[in-house]
Curated annotation (Swiss-Prot):
<protein>
    <recommendedName>
        <fullName>Glycerol-3-phosphate dehydrogenase [NAD(P)+]</fullName>
        <ecNumber>1.1.1.94</ecNumber>
    </recommendedName>
</protein>
<comment type="similarity">
    <text>Belongs to the NAD-dependent glycerol-3-phosphate dehydrogenase family.</text>
</comment>
<feature type="binding site">
    <location>
        <position position="291"/>
    </location>
    <ligand>
        <name>NADPH</name>
    </ligand>
</feature>
<feature type="binding site">
    <location>
        <position position="149"/>
    </location>
    <ligand>
        <name>sn-glycerol 3-phosphate</name>
    </ligand>
</feature>
<dbReference type="Pfam" id="PF01210">
    <property type="entry name" value="NAD_Gly3P_dh_N"/>
</dbReference>
<dbReference type="GO" id="GO:0046167">
    <property type="term" value="P:glycerol-3-phosphate biosynthetic process"/>
</dbReference>
<feature type="binding site">
    <location>
        <position position="118"/>
    </location>
    <ligand>
        <name>NADPH</name>
    </ligand>
</feature>
<dbReference type="GO" id="GO:0005975">
    <property type="term" value="P:carbohydrate metabolic process"/>
</dbReference>
<dbReference type="InterPro" id="IPR011128">
    <property type="entry name" value="G3P_DH_NAD-dep_N"/>
</dbReference>
<dbReference type="GO" id="GO:0051287">
    <property type="term" value="F:NAD binding"/>
</dbReference>
<feature type="binding site">
    <location>
        <position position="151"/>
    </location>
    <ligand>
        <name>NADPH</name>
    </ligand>
</feature>
<dbReference type="InterPro" id="IPR006168">
    <property type="entry name" value="G3P_DH_NAD-dep"/>
</dbReference>
<feature type="binding site">
    <location>
        <position position="256"/>
    </location>
    <ligand>
        <name>sn-glycerol 3-phosphate</name>
    </ligand>
</feature>
<feature type="binding site">
    <location>
        <position position="267"/>
    </location>
    <ligand>
        <name>NADPH</name>
    </ligand>
</feature>
<keyword id="KW-0444">Lipid biosynthesis</keyword>
<feature type="binding site">
    <location>
        <position position="23"/>
    </location>
    <ligand>
        <name>NADPH</name>
    </ligand>
</feature>
<feature type="binding site">
    <location>
        <position position="267"/>
    </location>
    <ligand>
        <name>sn-glycerol 3-phosphate</name>
    </ligand>
</feature>
Length: 345
């Protein structure tokens, strides 16, 4: 019998290290370790991580859900990164590049990096894969995990489906094997590395619009129209970037869009609701109490659309509300007042 050589600080084989101990990172770590696999969860605040270890739970974000025995809580980045070949980065998009720079010195020669971050690079609107290549070079295999997932439901073991994409087919297969749980968590393989990243950013913006519409009181018809036309905008931008159209009909496109636009577990939707009810941007964000990815994503997607010459009227109106002080009701009226168009355009 061949014994696996273990060379890490924990003295046992680590299936995966999750970088980021917010609600989503913690829920993924719980799900990954639920079947007995050893998983390291790293967070950058030692006091927060000490509390997670003492409680063996994340009471702030995931109340009532205990950590499996095989989930290891860690605040030492070097130990966490070197513990496993495979890293899953789950941090807000505006610190994605910073976190990659922080972990880079500790990477192993065989490290592979996947991220579940949804968004684009701040101030540039670049895809996160381009940020990762800039920071890490082309030596390491990269992948993206995306789809319709709320952290509380995932952590509670409720049925969930998601997709993973990478230029490295073996990395995709290995991630499917590690993440997939036949009873509660289904993972689909996808070959569209670009489209998978874009869907997660654009849907955040459209969800703010859907929330604004509902906050104003426009009803189900308007919400559905926003979702449908928002999907069209997502597809147009994806086509300009070379993404595969079918990706946007899958988990990382339509699936995530519908989830985020229709359920109040979505911070982006709740943020939009508050704006539609008359609150200003700062108050609406403060009321959420956690990062609202769609706020920054709106500027990033708007910048990307401008650079690519892609018309995205919903994104444009939401950008004007968030960054130029436009009234949400006026933005909705201006959308309806646009020149007549064919549905396919």
């Amino acid at each position: 019998m061949t014994q696996t050589l273990v060379n890490n600080a924990y003295g046992k084989e680590i299936s995966m290290t999750v970088i980021g101990a917010g609600s989503y990172g913690t829920s993924l770590a719980i799900s990954l370790s639920r079947n007995g696999a050893n998983v390291v969860l790293w967070g950058h605040e030692p006091e927060h991580m000490a509390k997670l270890e003492a409680d063996r739970a994340n009471h702030e974000f995931l109340p009532g859900i205990e950590f499996p025995p095989s989930l290891i809580v860690e605040s030492d980045l070097a130990k966490a990164v070197q513990a496993s070949r495979d890293l899953l980065v789950v941090v807000p998009s505006h610190v994605f590049g910073i976190v990659l720079n922080s972990l880079k010195p500790y990477l192993r020669d065989d490290s592979r990096i996947c991220w579940a971050t949804k968004g684009l690079e701040p101030e540039t609107g670049r895809l996160l894969k381009d940020v990762a290549f800039d920071v890490l070079g082309e030596h390491y295999s990269l992948a993206v995990l995306s789809g319709p997932t709320f952290a509380k439901e995932l952590a509670a073991g409720m049925p969930t489906a998601i997709s993973v994409a990478s230029p490295d087919a073996q990395f995709v297969a290995d991630l499917q094997e590690k993440i997939h749980c036949s009873k509660t968590f289904r993972v689909y393989a996808n070959s569209d590395f670009t489209g998978m990243q874009l869907g997660g950013a654009v849907k955040n913006v459209i969800a703010i619009g859907a929330g604004m519409s509902d906050g104003i009181g426009f009803g189900a018809n308007a919400r559905t129209a926003l979702i449908t036309r928002g999907l069209a905008e997502m597809c147009r931008l994806g086509a300009a970037l070379g993404a595969q159209p079918e990706t946007f009909m899958g988990m990382a496109g339509l699936g995530d869009l519908v989830l985020t636009c229709t359920d109040n577990q979505s911070r982006n939707r709740r943020f939009g609701l508050a704006l539609g009810q008359g609150k200003d941007v700062d108050t609406a964000q403060a009321d959420i109490g956690q990062v609202v990815e769609g706020y920054r994503n709106t500027k990033e997607v708007w910048m990307l659309a401008q650079r690519m010459g892609v018309e995205m009227p919903i994104v444009d109106q939401i950008y004007q509300v968030l960054y130029q002080g436009k009234d949400a009701r006026l933005a909705a009226q201006d959308l309806l007042a646009r020149d007549k168009k064919s549905e396919g355009k």
